[in-house]
Structure formats: C-alpha cells, structure tokens
C-alpha cells in the first residue's frame, strides 16, 4: 500500500468526483473578509476536509447510559451555526462539507488537525473503505475542563489516501455497508 500524492488526489477529484466540492490547494484565508481560517483543501499527501454548519452536541438530559446498540437522536441537541460550543468533557458530531467517493483500490485514514489537537480537541473518523461514498460523520471530543469552540466551513481533519497493491474481493458498497451514501450527520445504529 502506498500513500497518494497531491497530483493523484487532484486528478481523482476533478476527473472522477472523488471529493466534491474540491479546493485545489490549502485555503487559510477567507477570500471575502481576509480573516485567517483553520486551513482546508489539498495538501502534499492528503486533503483537509471541512465541517459543515450542522452539529449535534451530546446531552445527558434524556439518558443515563450510552449504548451503541440502542442509540437515539434525543441523545443530542441539534445546532445549525457558523460555530459550535462543545461543553467540557463532552463531544459533538458533525459532517463534512465535502462528499467523498472512494475508489475500489483505495482506503483512507483521517487524522485530526493539530490546531484543534493542541487545544485538547480530539477528532475521530473511521477509515473510508473501498467504494464507500457519502458525507463524513465526524466526532469531536472536548477533553478539556472548559467549553471549546469549533468552526464551520474550516478545516477539521486530514484525509490520507492509500492505494492497495491488489483489488479487494468485496468492497464496502458490495457488502451493503450501513453507512453507504450517508447524508448529513449519521448517528450510530446496529
């Protein structure tokens, strides 16, 4: 397996719709206001994805136990805004601005941006499997004892693309993965 470079990512995004919308290069300034942004877009060996304006912030108002087999929407408060405040020692779900279509011979890994990590915010995204497509559901944990702010339409994590030496026998699409073509924020289900 080898990591893919910027030229390959650009070609796959523009010719095959692997990433839509696609920012060809690192964007770190708002083009309208000149304000500094947490960067997003194409980098040397990856692509920095952005958060959308939709968030689900964890609340324990209706639950006393988190059970991944019986998870309900009322576990979260829904927010649509340019920023989201995550309570201390809590977490939020969001989804990417970008829609991804992963080729059959590719697996991705997603790593949180250091800007957030250095503030005590941990980003978790599972791998995008061969032939998976959809908006990425992103989990952001606030490990600090203080409220933490995250920004919509700015970078949150870097996606690394790995090309396999051989094609897999069964892709995510073929095994009818439960998160295939997910739209918006998708909460866990079994």
Curated annotation (Swiss-Prot):
E.C. code: 3.5.4.13
Pathway(s) the chain acts in: Pyrimidine metabolism; dUMP biosynthesis; dUMP from dCTP (dUTP route): step 1/2
One family name in Pfam for this protein: DCD
Active site per UniProt: 139 (proton donor/acceptor)
Cysteine disulfide partners in this protein: none
InterPro entries: dCTP_deaminase, dUTPase-like_sf, dUTPase_trimeric
An example molecular function term from Gene Ontology annotations: nucleotide binding
Gene Ontology BP terms: dUMP biosynthetic process; dUTP biosynthetic process; nucleobase-containing small molecule interconversion
Catalyzed reactions: dCTP + H2O + H(+) = dUTP + NH4(+)
UniProt keyword terms in alphabetical order: Hydrolase, Nucleotide metabolism, Nucleotide-binding
Top EC class for this record: hydrolase
Residues holding dCTP: 113-118, 158, 172, 181-182
PANTHER family the record matches: DCTP DEAMINASE (PTHR42680:SF3)
Function: Catalyzes the deamination of dCTP to dUTP.
Record note on quaternary structure: Homotrimer.
Family to which the UniProt record says this protein belongs: Belongs to the dCTP deaminase family.
Protein's name in the database: dCTP deaminase
Gene encoding the protein: dcd
